[in-house]
């Protein structure tokens, strides 16, 4: 085994035998790995075994089996997120999305930093729905989906009232609408935002203000994109879909 010091985000844990746990951690430098924690309830690591916990770990890495946690420091527990059902649900979804987007044991520091920053912004109170949309758009390439939301697939002009074409997997400008009789007839303003989401840097993001009607259009479009081009169905996604129906009751209370 080798020793590695790295930041890591706990994805989930599950019981193993009587009092042991298997803990999956997405680390910045070692990728996603499974860690064995013996006597978890009595372990000094118990405080950092919960999902959505980030810490600086000292790890014993086994490239051919289970790895082990040797020590930790600098714990970030996302208290605001964990105390809010809506924030927690969206945070859990993007974490699950990151989990399925890359293989185990493969380092992806860029994705780790992106996920960590997204969770921090949710914790800080920025719009968790739009942050999730940005995460979804920028994660598409991890699933091998390369869609251009910037210019027309035929003439490459920009800044026009575009529509999306599944036939051409991209945008059509008004001069080329005729190329696809089954184009989606989408709101061009929504596609403009999707294009912004594809390239936006979180360091440039200070505030988010998107009307509910536009949020719904974005949500429906990204659901369509993920269904057709990615094809994954996560329990955490179904839960936030259900929130849109009964969650409004809780918000009104």
Swiss-Prot record:
HAMAP family in the cross-refs: RecO
One GO process term, biological-process aspect: double-strand break repair
NCBIfam families found in the cross-reference section: reco
Protein's name in the database: DNA repair protein RecO
UniProt keywords, alphabetically: DNA damage, DNA recombination, DNA repair
Family to which this protein belongs: Belongs to the RecO family.
One term under GO cellular component: bacterial nucleoid
Coiled coil found in the keyword field: no
Stored Pfam families: RecO_C, RecO_N
Function of the molecule: Involved in DNA repair and RecF pathway recombination.
PANTHER family assigned: DNA REPAIR PROTEIN RECO
Gene: recO
